[in-house]
Design a protein with these regions (language model features):
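Beta-strand elements of repeat-based all-beta scaffolds
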Residues: 1-16, 21-125, 129-203, 207-244
């Protein structure tokens, strides 16, 4: 190889793990001799059925012979979520906060409500934007995302607790006309194939995107229906399987 050819750049990295095998520290040596260091802290909580290992803090630093500069820090606090079975519980995020190097809050998410499966049903970002999630299929999939409405407003529009929808499997009739009952909100709806994935997504403007799958559960196309009733293909997938 000629001397002036570019040689492969080697970047030394180190990984450290805690006693449970989780990554606790990752460092990368820069060309100027400084290092970028990511540190991870976890906590253990007894969830009734077993021990939960939960991320509680993350920091990103620049270190060197004469420096140790904090660039970013994230923290997570947790609250207890009680399942439908009174003997079961688990811990779910309550507040997720991101700080810059000076300790100033850059972003905060508050998880104010959850369903019996531990899914978040209300998230507030930076004390302002409310997003409500309605779940179905026994808590497996979100069936609606609602922006610019509070948990109580959505509950009034539904005529029931938003979290209660999670325990239904099929489409809940209370979702019909929800956008009209929340005119200032942005409501998105989702339906699902039992053994594949999302089958439809209806945007706040009422336009619906449909998703079709083959017998193996692979997405073959997504489309909308035009005003003339014809399909408007958005994505079309062809799969070529070798040795099958």
């Amino acid at each position: 190889m000629p001397d002036n050819d570019m040689k492969a750049l080697q970047v030394p990295e180190w990984y450290e793990y805690d006693k449970d095998g989780y990554l606790s520290r990752h460092s990368v040596l820069k060309s100027d001799g400084d290092s970028l260091v990511d540190s991870y802290t976890r906590i253990h909580r007894n969830a009734g059925y077993g021990i939960q290992v939960l991320p509680s803090e993350y920091s990103h630093r620049m270190t060197g012979s004469d420096k140790n500069i904090l660039l970013k820090r994230d923290t997570v606090s947790y609250s207890v979520c009680q399942s439908a079975n009174a003997s079961d519980r688990w811990y779910v995020p309550q507040v997720v906060t991101s700080f810059d190097g000076s300790g100033k809050v850059q972003n905060m998410k508050e998880y104010l409500h959850c369903d019996v499966y531990g899914n978040p049903t209300e998230i507030v970002t930076n004390h302002s934007e409310h997003i409500i999630y309605l779940w179905g299929y026994y808590g497996k999939h979100p069936v609606s995302q609602i922006k610019n409405a509070t948990y109580s407003e959505v509950g009034s529009a539904l005529g029931k607790s938003p979290a209660s929808l999670s325990q239904a499997y099929s489409y809940d009739s209370s979702l019909a006309g929800l956008q009209a009952r929340l005119p200032k909100a942005q409501v998105t709806f989702y339906t699902y194939h039992p053994y594949a994935g999302i089958s439809s997504e209806t945007a706040p403007d009422g336009k619906t995107t449909y998703y079709d799958y083959d017998a193996k559960g692979w997405l073959i196309k997504s489309y909308r229906t035009g005003e003339n009733g014809k399909q408007e293909i958005l994505q079309l997938n062809n799969y070529h399987i070798i040795n099958e």
